[in-house]
């Protein structure tokens, strides 16, 4: 990707080179075909050159055509109005070319980022899991024998260890007569390994007579319960906020919240795209920061300069409770531990503004009974206090409940009390509680 980024380099010039190019183009078209060219340039070259430079600078400042003509920057030229018109046209072409070339550079940057992303995915596949069949030969044989007693034939079984020292078991199995629950095989593996295990997300419930691939993971320590409350802007038909909550086989739970610019259908479509891209990238195996970069580059190349969306991504490792947050133009997040609330903020531009978006990861540790509260800007912005983040933190702290749904609804209700019940922007409140199994 480094070599790819280096191809070509920038072909656009600084301000002085831009002036020279415009000057050369204008004089090449008008002066070269003018009968008075020799008189003007031989007798008054220094003066004429300075006057044309002043006119060119006015064009670059985007002054109006009539204003430039009235200022008479070039006093001795009978074709001065035509010269101004030609300079404006030439500058317009130069700006268009510059914009298109920037898009090409952005495309090249995106492709380089995609190459980097694919490299990371391949590296993760190479180093994330290590085959340990040799050290698990006895366990593999016992699982095959135990499964056979349950009517399950095991064709292949392999043990892997992740970089976090967790066990993954992959197998090809079938039921001789069909109709055996796959959980029977899970119980066989738990009995032999002495570990608490779980099946992959997309796993058949009943084994058939055909071979089926089954992957088993070490079970996680925590589970989550979630709640959602929201209101659309009073003058809108639909909320411009979107969110998604999903877990992965690797034992992570992801919450993705996006607030589209403005409100209504356009904002909804933009935030929906952000959430959809993030979910697909993460489920495809990309790390969260890489997924954010790919999503951002897609939004930049979408090419709509006034269409941006925020991204608030929280990922919880259900093995150890580690929380990782990435905020792209998003509102503050609140972590509630009993009656104490921690406010997490980050300043960054919304998605789609800059192709080289800075990605900052914020990490916290969650414990049994903690709540994560994520909101969009509409929940905070219209609290009529000097520090709305602290006000919302106090609201969350005062609520006593172990129910995520109740927490999210009470937060929204109390915010609406502060705004007099009027919803001036789309409001979304997500509450995620983490509990030990």
Where are these regions (language model features)?
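Catalytic core of PPM/PP2C metal-dependent serine/threonine phosphatase domains
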Residues: 131-164, 184-186, 190-211, 268-338, ...
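Acidic loop->beta-strand submotif enriched in PP2C/PPM serine/threonine phosphatases
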Residues: 236-252, 311, 343-384, 420-421
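Intracellular, membrane-proximal regulatory regions of polytopic membrane proteins
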Residues: 1-141
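Active-site-proximal, acidic helix/loop segment immediately C-terminal to a metal-coordinating Asp/Glu
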Residues: 260-284, 347-348, 366, 370-419
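PP2C/PPM family metal-dependent serine/threonine protein phosphatase catalytic domain
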Residues: 218-242, 296-302, 331-363, 413-417
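A short interface-forming secondary-structure element
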Residues: 169-178, 330
